[in-house]
Amino acid sequence: MGNMRCMYLPTGKYRCSVRNLEGSLADENITVTDMALEKNYDLTVGSLSGKATWENGSSFDANTPWGIYLENKDISFEGNITQDGSYKIPNITAYGTYDVTVIPLNGSDDRTKVGTVTINSETTEQDFVISGYLLQITLQDSTGEGKSFVNVTISGPETSPVNYECFTNFRGEISLIVSTPGTYEISVNNISCGNVTVTDKNVAKVIQM
């Protein structure tokens, strides 16, 4: 039996999370009014596993960590994608239909939707295909050291005029998914520092500044 805890909170909107050592068991938006609110969670834990592949035939890079997420308007769960594309999302505590998104964890905050899944049993398996192309960019100084925590703008080609705002990680790296081939301009402080051209596969490039 779980523990019961009383909390006194100002009225407003909150995020209620229940976690163990393996991760999130429940994660829900709640609204506190001037009335008493009681929340109970039946924590029957399930899992989702499978494999993610690239539609363009590329493989996952060992140096780029990936997250995979189940999301709906009230609750979310998360897991990691390994180098061979396999993944597992443990501790799913609510049956239902979810959007499935992926994101490189050293890149932008933009998640890419790869499908939906219905969780209605304790064990679910489903594979997903990632459309688009991965840009892996490393910014270095003249000595070859990565330029960490730099705000970078990536401007899309004329066929897809979109700008992505990203911060490099502590190694000077950025990874993000773009939807169309073409030449992308890399800028820092509105100054162009190079281009990356996407043809039919994921692309990695080092840019020295």
Predicted ranges, named:
Residues 24-28, 73-80, 109-115, 159-166, ...:
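Surface-exposed loop/edge segments in extracytoplasmic proteins
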Residues 1-7, 11, 71-90, 157-175:
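Short, acidic Ser/Thr/Gly-rich low-complexity loop/linker segments typical of extracellular
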Residues 57-62, 144-148:
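A short beta-turn/strand-edge loop motif at beta-sheet boundaries
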Residues 64-70, 150-155, 186:
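Hydrophobic beta-strand segments
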Residues 28-45, 115-132, 196-209:
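Extracellular beta-sheet/turn segments enriched in Thr/Pro/Gly and aliphatic residues
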